[in-house]
Amino acid sequence: MLRIADKTFESHLFTGTGKFAAPKVMVEAIRASGSQLVTLAMKRVDLRQRNDAILAPLLAAGVSLLPNTSGAKTAEEAVFAARLAREALGTHWLKLEIHPDARWLLPDPIETLKAAELLVREGFVVLPYCGADPVLCKRLEEVGCAAVMPLGAPIGSNQGLETKAMLEIIIEQATVPVVVDAGIGVPSHAAQALEMGADAVLVNTAIAVADDPVAMARAFRMAIDAGLLARQAGPGARSTQAQATSPLTGFLEALA
């Protein structure tokens, strides 16, 4: 079980809602993934309409919604979007995203920390998307974020855990859940993140753009389970030398 703030999740896989060919495919994939927490970009939905094409099926699916501030370029814009989301959706949970450069979509560390501090004071459960910077993640934790969401690689790149060395440090020093977000391209990347000690991963593009999003969602679900089980099983220590799995000479001596 995974606990973040006031909620407990059985699934360690969080999913996004962007890039799907149709809302029906999106909902089917989310169900296949087993995900219980789904991110939702505020700029993509009509908050005045509960029958919005994206919002309505998510509400019907019974998943917890995690509105995000994607599109915000400053702390002020992110705080404004967060307040709108809380009023419209009735949730104090928020994925904080601030990326001023539309080409690279890398999170702004200064604005993210500033917004996180303000939002925590206002009672939000803040899950910030951030760079794989151990110092920044610790600062976000210290100002009261309920979890940290460092990137594995740039959003939508499918490159995998390019920031593995930094993620390992973040995981080792964290006292809040670590959710690896962005760049995860195939199920094996997700399994690796869980094996490393991450508490969860968030996947969107890899599922949404697959030839069969529902099958890919199911594959990610299995990979998450495998990665978590492998970590709990206690992997053997790595060695720089070969280690024989059976005696090399004993059987020859027995025959002599």
Swiss-Prot record:
Residues the record lists as binding 1-deoxy-D-xylulose 5-phosphate: G156, A182, G183, N204, T205
EC primary class: transferase
Family: Belongs to the ThiG family.
Origin: domain of life: Bacteria
Complex and partners: Homotetramer. Forms heterodimers with either ThiH or ThiS.
A Pfam family matched in the record: ThiG
EC number of this enzyme: 2.8.1.10
Presence of keyword Cytoplasm: yes
Keyword Transferase: yes
A GO molecular function held by the record: thiazole synthase activity
PANTHER family from the UniProt entry: THIAZOLE SYNTHASE
The species this protein was found in: Klebsiella pneumoniae subsp. pneumoniae (strain ATCC 700721 / MGH 78578)
Location of the protein in the cell: Cytoplasm
Catalytic activity of the protein: [ThiS sulfur-carrier protein]-C-terminal-Gly-aminoethanethioate + 2-iminoacetate + 1-deoxy-D-xylulose 5-phosphate = [ThiS sulfur-carrier protein]-C-terminal Gly-Gly + 2-[(2R,5Z)-2-carboxy-4-methylthiazol-5(2H)-ylidene]ethyl phosphate + 2 H2O + H(+)
Active site, renumbered: K95 (schiff-base intermediate with dxp)
Purpose of the protein: Catalyzes the rearrangement of 1-deoxy-D-xylulose 5-phosphate (DXP) to produce the thiazole phosphate moiety of thiamine. Sulfur is provided by the thiocarboxylate moiety of the carrier protein ThiS. In vitro, sulfur can be provided by H(2)S.
Principal subcellular localization: cytoplasm
HAMAP family in the record: ThiG
Keywords tagged on the record: Cytoplasm, Schiff base, Thiamine biosynthesis, Transferase
Pathway: Cofactor biosynthesis; thiamine diphosphate biosynthesis
Protein name as catalogued: Thiazole synthase
